[in-house]
């Protein structure tokens, strides 16, 4: 890619997760284990336990959100309950939140920061960082959705793989200077170092999928440098679907007396409404089996995960030769093309996406209801993030994982142990589509 010299780019290989130890949930206030569906909050204050928070606009009204936000929420048609705690964040305390995929973590910080924001022209008040360009682009779009009735709020997204000069032009113009900045650490740090992006007025510092950024030394270094460029007096919020015991102390170093919010028992971070199966087969049988599944299963959109960019390209080519309308998304594709393909898939112009783990976290495409692990991931947490692409926000979905080696069988056992579930073998007669089609 061009313009790589001025940024740190993160490839799929660098996105390999570290082997995280299984975590356990914080106990409820009365000392009893938190039940499934409970929200457990721990922190410097006395422990609190809440439960489901309504996502109807009437539920949001209880939080005393701005009227402009309530109108946008109504327009978005939110109907499902969310277990993630919005009132906690609105109290302007630091928050460390773990909640499984699809439970509306993004909405928590987007709504909280928009509610608290008093935009000043030419000042950045909110900084949101995430580890991939696609996720940054998506978060920026969420801000656009919810700020539609807040015309004075300006949002911009900055990430690697695009000319940095375009970002500098946005930041050089007071009319376009963003109040909310979303981006990846490498590009943001380059802009801060060049003194093009001033963070001296930041009031909210947010890390989405925080464990991914703080797990990797290079990315953590960028985050730390950016953090040091912000004021001491600010709210820090961090979110992820997986927070190991090892990463939590690292997160807390950025915070002051944070409230820790854990939705559901850590070991039971399964996805309600998502059916999960595996198929044992040899490597040479994968293509035929995939073809059969795509022919016989009903689905709105499917995401197929592979372990490398080369395999993504090869499988995408094969699918298109078999007349399946697919696209491939991975770090080997230019940034402009990746965003173009992401939009094609998001807008339902393509129904099949072949992807590496670069697409495995946080990406929210509501029509995906089938996830296939053509190659099983290396660890249980990556599995959770991948299959979480189907069955977002408590909707129905189906995931099927190919198991073709001893290593795969070991990962399968780790998944079952980590999340205390028994994954059944995919039935010979298939699955009734009414059980996973909304």
Swiss-Prot record:
Residues 86-261 form the Helicase ATP-binding domain. Residues 289-434 form the Helicase C-terminal domain. It is an enzyme of class 3 (hydrolase). Residues 23-42 are annotated as: Disordered. A motif (DEAD box) lies at residues 208-211. Belongs to the DEAD box helicase family. DECD subfamily. This is ATP-dependent RNA helicase sub2. It comes from Aspergillus terreus (strain NIH 2624 / FGSC A1156).
